[in-house]
Amino acid sequence: MSEATPAIAVDGLYKRFGIVEAVAGIDFTVAAGSTTALLGGNGAGKTTTLSILLGLLVPTAGQVRVFGEDMVRHRHRVLPGMNFSSPYVDLPRRLTVIENLTVYGHLYGLSDVSDRIRHLARDLDIEAFLRRPTGDLSSGQRTRVALAKALLNEPRLLLLDEPTASLDPDTADWVRGYLESYQRESGATLLLASHNMGEVERLCDQVLMMRRGAIVDRGKPADLIDRYGRETLEQVFLDIARSGDGAGGAPNTDTGATP
């Protein structure tokens, strides 16, 4: 992969479930080493897009390339460099935290599972409950464990679905700070699905505004705010949600996010 090859390149992507068009012909790129958000309300197509990127769903039409590899044809070559974190994906609740992480470490083919768990336990402040059943943890603790699971294989691409959903403000702020530091220090590429405007403004180089399966506008958070003449990304989001279109009635096609 050359330095110019994007981490993600999506071209003409469609996904239909019967007569429902969940993803409606979207195109976007994500630069390697950047952080991008899929921003939209419920039913916008964010999670479906992530599921296609993870190889969990096959697109109806279109192409998805991850690090230059076709995701549909060569997912076995792509997946080892990726991982996924979501508060909605439950780890086996009867297993202890360390048992869960050990199982996943072996599934990822790691040779140094114990060392990697110790490192992440320290970084994510989960050492105190490594030997507790995962089902006994608070939502904030489970979110940290889910992140540890997702980072075990040191992914080049980390996909996150609503990473701070249902967290109290203090824990949510800690998670955002950790993701910010992790991306900066590791150089990994992050793609997150969210409808938390403050989170997106803080973390992201590029925002893809989604509505009813389509990308209706895109750009850096500050550029979107300026383009719509607003003070916050939340106000931009509400403008788009109420109008059903992007600024000036047409999407901005500039896809260049810089790290």
Predicted regions and their residues:
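Conserved ABC ATPase signature
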Residues: 133-137
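ABC ATPase "signature
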Residues: 218-219
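Conserved catalytic motifs of ABC-family nucleotide-binding domains
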Residues: 154
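Catalytic Walker B motif of ABC-type/P-loop ATPase nucleotide-binding domains
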Residues: 158-162
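Conserved ABC ATPase "signature" region
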Residues: 102, 106-129
